[in-house]
């Protein structure tokens, strides 16, 4: 499992590994891929800032190229996941390559301008997708981000309709 993460999440990775071990007997490795500039490195295309002053860049292609260098052993099964913008990146990555058997997108930023349309216009290359939406995400006052609930339900419906093994919690 490759998880895109930032400094703010490093302290919880040990607990995450322990929780995964409780739930599976499958041997696994968690690779934490640290991201420094989230709005640039994880964004598939440029978009204006939706909070603060920092616009979104288009560094996802380069980030994915770096991640794929970790996935060269064809005898292994690879999964990718992340939270928020890293969840969006993980979903986007599933449309770029068939290297990842599954995607874990926790509260993904599917409100990102144009992303749901992108999902509908391209073919996903992963077999399984896990999506989650927290209790507070769609209750924000930010008009763009408050659409996350509608967007994630649309994306989930689209994936199910097209035969993808998908869970939404």
Where would I find each of the regions flagged by the language model?
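A conserved short beta-strand
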Residues: 99-111
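Active-site signature of alpha/beta-hydrolase-fold catalytic machinery across serine-
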Residues: 92-96
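The feature captures the conserved acid-bearing segment of alpha/beta-hydrolase catalytic domains
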Residues: 109-169
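A general structural motif
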Residues: 27, 75-77, 100, 124-128, ...
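Serine-hydrolase catalytic machinery in alpha/beta-hydrolase-like enzymes
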Residues: 1-70
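Solvent-exposed loop/turn segments at secondary-structure junctions
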Residues: 6-10, 36-39, 87-88, 110-111, ...
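The conserved beta1-alpha1 loop
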Residues: 2-6, 107, 133
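Gly/Ala-rich beta-loop-alpha elbow adjacent to hydrolase catalytic centers
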Residues: 81-86, 90
């Amino acid at each position: 499992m490759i998880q895109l993460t930032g400094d703010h999440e490093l302290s919880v990775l040990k607990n995450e590994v322990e929780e995964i071990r409780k739930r599976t007997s499958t041997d696994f490795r968690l690779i934490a891929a640290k991201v420094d500039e989230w709005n640039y490195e994880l964004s598939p295309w440029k978009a204006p800032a939706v909070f603060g002053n920092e616009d979104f860049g288009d560094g996802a292609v380069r980030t994915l190229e770096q991640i794929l260098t970790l996935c060269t052993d064809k005898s292994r099964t690879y999964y990718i996941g992340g939270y928020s913008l890293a969840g969006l990146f993980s979903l986007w990555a599933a449309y770029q390559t068939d290297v990842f058997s599954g995607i874990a997108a926790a509260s993904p930023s599917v409100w990102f301008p144009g992303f749901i349309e992108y999902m509908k216009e391209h073919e996903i290359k992963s077999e399984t997708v896990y999506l989650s939406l927290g209790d507070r995400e769609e209750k924000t006052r930010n008009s763009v981000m408050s659409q996350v609930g509608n967007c994630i339900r649309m994306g989930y419906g689209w994936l199910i309709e097209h035969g993808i093994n998908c869970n939404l919690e």
